[in-house]
Amino acid sequence: MIRPSAFSYEDLLQCGRGEMFGPGNAQLPMPPMLMFDRITYISDEGGAFGKGEINAEMEIKPDSWFFNCHFPSDPVMPGCLGLDAMWQLLGFYLAWRGGPGHGRALGSGEVKFTGQVTPKNKLVTYHINLKRVIMRKLVMGIADGIMAVDGREIYLAKDLRVGLFVSTDSF
């Protein structure tokens, strides 16, 4: 089966509605929690570790919901939203690879924030490098992620972990 290597905003919304990977399988969050506008490239080959990679983008709009509340007089995108975007992308990757179940973030190793996103910025880019992919009874991905704003790397997350679970009753 040939899988698409890029996804539009409409494709991502389809995934959020549960229409992409089938009932009971991974979904992306819907806006405003969907933290990217498109996946520009996804592959199960290549990347820094030869296990696959994902690239995605989000255009920054000065009226984005998070700027109004974080913080009204000093608007900045919360760092946790960038981190969540990386988990979202890793979960999407596992579903794209055919893994069944609902995605859940399981943690990360080192996380560094060395910059910020403000209403003056234009474009956030994400690059996820898969380190390990387990596609057995346990479906889990481990990856390193980088977030950049207007070409400058500002977030680094090592050992991001996401699993897919057929049942989340005991979670």
From Swiss-Prot:
Keywords: Cytoplasm, Fatty acid biosynthesis, Fatty acid metabolism, Isomerase, Lipid biosynthesis, Lipid metabolism, Lyase. Signal peptide: none annotated. Pathway: Lipid metabolism; fatty acid biosynthesis. It is found in: Cytoplasm. One of its GO terms (molecular function) is (3R)-hydroxyacyl-[acyl-carrier-protein] dehydratase activity. Coiled coil: none annotated. It catalyses: a (3R)-hydroxyacyl-[ACP] = a (2E)-enoyl-[ACP] + H2O; (3R)-hydroxydecanoyl-[ACP] = (2E)-decenoyl-[ACP] + H2O; (2E)-decenoyl-[ACP] = (3Z)-decenoyl-[ACP]. The keyword rRNA-binding does not apply. Necessary for the introduction of cis unsaturation into fatty acids. Catalyzes the dehydration of (3R)-3-hydroxydecanoyl-ACP to E-(2)-decenoyl-ACP and then its isomerization to Z-(3)-decenoyl-ACP. Can catalyze the dehydratase reaction for beta-hydroxyacyl-ACPs with saturated chain lengths up to 16:0, being most active on intermediate chain length. Homodimer. This is 3-hydroxydecanoyl-[acyl-carrier-protein] dehydratase. It comes from Nitrosococcus oceani (strain ATCC 19707 / BCRC 17464 / JCM 30415 / NCIMB 11848 / C-107).
